[in-house]
Amino acid sequence: MMTMDAADSRVVRAPQSPRTTLAALGLVLVFLAGLAVVPRVFAFHQGSLVGRDVPEFSLSLVANGAAIGGDGARVTMGQLRGRAVLLDFWATWCPPCRAEAPIVDKISRRWSDRGVVVIGVDTDTADQGDPREFAIAHGLTYPIVQDLSGAASRSYAIESIPTLVVVSRTGKVVAVRTGITDDAEIERLLQQALD
């Protein structure tokens, strides 16, 4: 049996060269620079939609579709021309999306009589959550379409969720917001879309 005395059990550090320290510091700086640049790249990409014609899509209504054709009907952006539109790209598994859903529902209820249509665009794949169950569980009343193929998300340059896209009556993108957006900001953007 082997025994170890206290002097032998101490931790010995390998000597570090200044090169190693500088390399580690360099990696940290590159990482921090990346954190600063990546959001700007995404914002630029999405911001490039602002002022342009809204990308077209044709997606199936999966929940709360009575007001615009009934569940199972196809919804296109062309059908909605003449009305301001708030598109909410989200997924059932996304905690920030769950937090924003009641805000979007409140906006839908407040603005529906002013010519605004709110549409939730579920980005779940077929093996993820059920948007109908999500709508029921969260008391959502606005129409929800499903983007199973991801084509709509790609055409709108959706890189993260939740993302809101505000569209004017003339079919131009007014704003794109990623992350939880408060109701005052959404209402300000919708007013812009109606003006």
Give the role of each language-model region.
Residues M1-A66, D195:
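N-terminal targeting signals for export/organelle localization
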Residues F57-V85, S108:
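A short beta-strand-turn-helix
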Residues L80-R83, D113, L140-T141, I158:
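Active-site acidic short loop of glycosyltransferases
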Residues R83-V85, F89-W93, S160:
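Short pre-active-site segment immediately N-terminal to redox-active cysteine/selenocysteine motifs
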Residues D88, G120-D122, V165-V166:
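Hydrophobic beta-strand core positions in alpha/beta domains
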Residues R98-H138, L148-S155, R188:
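Structural microenvironment flanking redox-active thiols in thiol-disulfide oxidoreductases
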Residues E133-T141, Q146-A193:
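Thiol/disulfide oxidoreductase modules built on the thioredoxin-like
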